[in-house]
C-alpha cells in the first residue's frame, strides 16, 4: 500500500493480484506501458539523489526525459504507464521499496538488480543493492 497525502491517491496490489489506484474518480486497474519504438524513454528519478554511476547509466539510454518525483511514487508512475524506467544506483533500504515494488509487479513491471536478478527481501543486509525498475 502506498498513500499519497498531497493528492489523496492510494495504490495497492502485487504479483498475481494485479494493482489498483484509488482517487476521487474511483478505482482504476493499473497497467505498465513499455516504450514504443522511436518513443523517448520516460525515466523517473531524483535530482537530489543522482550520482556518477546513475549519470553513466543514463548516458547509455540515448534520448530520455527525466521526471523528478519522490520516493515510492517513482514505482507508481511506472505502474500507471506514465513512465518506463527507474534506475536506482544509490542506497535504499528494504522498507523504501517493498510496497511499491509489489504494486509495480502487479501492474506488469519488474525490479531487478544490475545483475538481472529480482530484487529480494528478508536478507541479512537491509540495504538494497543497486536496481532498475522497468515497465517491461
Where are these regions (language model features)?
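Acidic beta-strand-loop-alpha-helix segment within the catalytic core
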Residues: 1-75, 125-136
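Oxyanion/phosphate-interacting regions
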Residues: 56-60, 75-136
